């Protein structure tokens, strides 16, 4: 069960995703340029930014999500972070990798599952992102690209599976 995995395990996988982004930068940048017309230099920069974000969340998520005791009017209180479940992201086309990674990296590091409904004109980017997480070693289903028309998004939103929307 994904939510029961350790931060150390999740961090290792997220660092692998960062490595894959760096290693395959040209392939991913080319797909971004082909699908949505972004200049190749900007597409490369977007992929680089995504790799950096994966590394950042791999290194710092455990600290961000650590249990915290705070003094309140009630005395001493505990802030406890727990996985929510499946989180759906409905993303635009203009930053087809960055918008997704800035959602997926913290969601997955927190022990949640990420569901992506990307813009229809960047389906290739959507599927590449799913493959990056799979190739990095994330279990199948932990990050899923939902390739479907915009009109079906409401059905997914209303699903009992979805516990949050980004």
Regions found by a protein language model. Name each.
Residues 66-166:
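Rossmann-like NAD(P) dinucleotide-binding subdomain of oxidoreductase/dehydrogenase enzymes
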Residues 1-64, 74:
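Glycine-rich loop-to-alpha-helix module at the N-terminal edge of alpha/beta enzyme cores
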